[in-house]
Regions:
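Flexible glycine/acidic-rich beta-alpha junction loops that bind and position SAM and/or redox cofactors
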Residues: 1-16, 32-61
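Anionic-ligand-binding alpha/beta catalytic cores of soluble enzymes and soluble regulatory domains
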Residues: 18-21
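Conserved, mostly hydrophobic/aromatic
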Residues: 25, 91
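C-terminal extensions
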Residues: 46-76, 102-170
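Residue-level signature of tetratricopeptide-repeat
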Residues: 94-95
Length: 170
């Protein structure tokens, strides 16, 4: 039996949050076309406790974003946090007939609180948003559960406190 410290003790279940993140990652690999090496790497060996694996991947690959809703292909749209398989099909079908707005995306089931950092509609982002890893991660954590900002271990957390100026458009 392996006595590695990173394993749960005998008779102890694995941490539920970790189990849930592994389930989400499995789902991404089965239905969204992700590879295990894309979700975790030598540099990033574990999942973030506060954001899901799809968001974590997107934040780590900001060079691929923002994605234009009107022109992005099926597999590119699948990689956008907040957009699932049903929403991708609806987007591709609807954009053949009209330009899509953020209101249209919301009606189609897109979770805009996650997707807004990674998409454009007609060349425009929903808000004046910085494509910055720390900024986006901070806002994703806050949007998921506002109390997460209080739960985060301040010693290991590199995320900065949100500023009122983050919400003011120039």
């Amino acid at each position: 039996v392996n006595m590695d410290e990173s394993l749960p003790g005998i008779g102890q279940p694995p941490p539920l949050k970790r189990e849930h993140r592994l389930y989400q990652a499995d789902f991404l690999m089965r239905f969204y076309g992700f590879k295990a090496g894309e979700l975790l790497s030598e540099d990033n060996q574990s999942f973030n406790d506060y954001i899901d694996p799809k968001c974590q991947w997107a934040v780590g690959h900001l060079e691929r974003f923002p994605v234009e809703i009107m022109t992005a292909d099926y597999y590119t749209l699948l990689r956008v946090p907040g957009i699932g398989t049903n929403s991708v099909r609806r987007i591709i079908k609807a954009r053949k007939h009209a330009k899509l707005s953020f209101a249209d995306l919301k009606k189609m089931g897109v979770v805009l609180k996650r997707a807004l950092y990674f998409i454009t509609c007609d060349g425009r982002m929903m808000y004046n948003t910085k494509l910055d890893e720390s900024y986006i991660t901070r806002h994703l954590i806050y949007n998921e559960r506002p109390d997460n900002m209080l739960l985060a271990d301040n010693k290991s957390c590199t995320y900065e406190q949100m500023s009122i100026f983050d919400f003011i458009s120039e």
